């Protein structure tokens, strides 16, 4: 029973971010912000990273908040999809 539940669970990463670019066809750029503590100075620092994400129906615009999930490579740079 326990093994059956484990097969259904996904171990892919899910992140939340803001769409910063939606100019390309079926592709958006999503900026994900994280707050981390600096190891030496113990100060909270905001880290940002942009992800190239597959948007199948071109439904997202700049400023939208989206959830993205890891996926098999779709192109040379796209490894995330919108959920």
UniProtKB/Swiss-Prot annotation:
Keywords, alphabetical: Ribonucleoprotein, Ribosomal protein, RNA-binding, rRNA-binding
GO cellular component: cytosolic small ribosomal subunit
InterPro entries reported in the protein's UniProt record: NA-bd_OB-fold, Ribosomal_uS17, Ribosomal_uS17_bact/chlr
CDD domains: Ribosomal_uS17
Pfam families, per the entry: Ribosomal_S17 (PF00366)
GO MF annotation: an example: rRNA binding
Keyword Ribosomal protein carried by entry: yes
GO biological process: translation
Keyword Nucleus: no
SUPFAM superfamilies reported in the protein's UniProt record: Nucleic acid-binding proteins
Family: Belongs to the universal ribosomal protein uS17 family.
Function: One of the primary rRNA binding proteins, it binds specifically to the 5'-end of 16S ribosomal RNA.
Protein name: Small ribosomal subunit protein uS17
Classification lineage: Bacteria, Pseudomonadati, Pseudomonadota, Alphaproteobacteria, Rickettsiales
Gene: rpsQ
